[in-house]
Amino acid sequence: MNLELIHEDFRGKISRLVEGFKTFPEVTIFETKAGFCRGGCIHRLSDESVVVLEGEIVYVTPKGYFNLTRGENFIISKNTPHYFLSRTDSVVLEWGPKEEEKKEKHADFRRIVDNINHERLTWKQ
């Protein structure tokens, strides 16, 4: 099992599992700094499962806010827009949607994510 870095920016890193687990060909690990958001997406065909490996996050969906800490998991049903805010530095493991599904963004939720990240980045400077 190997991790491949696929993206790194001011929020942290995103890596994916590149060997094994053929049932879920994309297993992604998000390392996110406190105060920043990830996501703003929607997956049309697959549910998404997540588990917090380190830290504290809050998942946001149209159904509400869901606080998660180390060891807790969450399932996001298909067709549910979502994002998470990292309350502390965090590491989140997610799996389920295929790579092509992960590309679709939900316009309203993505706008929220971009605004929060912009405000946080401005505040840090």
Language-model segments: residues:
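A short, N-terminal "cap"/entry segment at the start of jelly-roll beta-barrel domains
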Residues: 1-26, 39, 124-125
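Double-stranded beta-helix
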Residues: 2-10, 87-125
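Conserved short histidine dyad/triad with adjacent acidic residue
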Residues: 28-44
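Glycine- and acidic-residue-biased ligand/ion/polar-headgroup-sensing regions
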Residues: 45-58
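A cytosolic small-molecule/anion-sensing beta-strand core signal
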Residues: 53-54, 70, 88
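Structural motif
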Residues: 56, 81, 89-91
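Short acidic-glycine-tyrosine-enriched beta hairpin
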Residues: 62-81
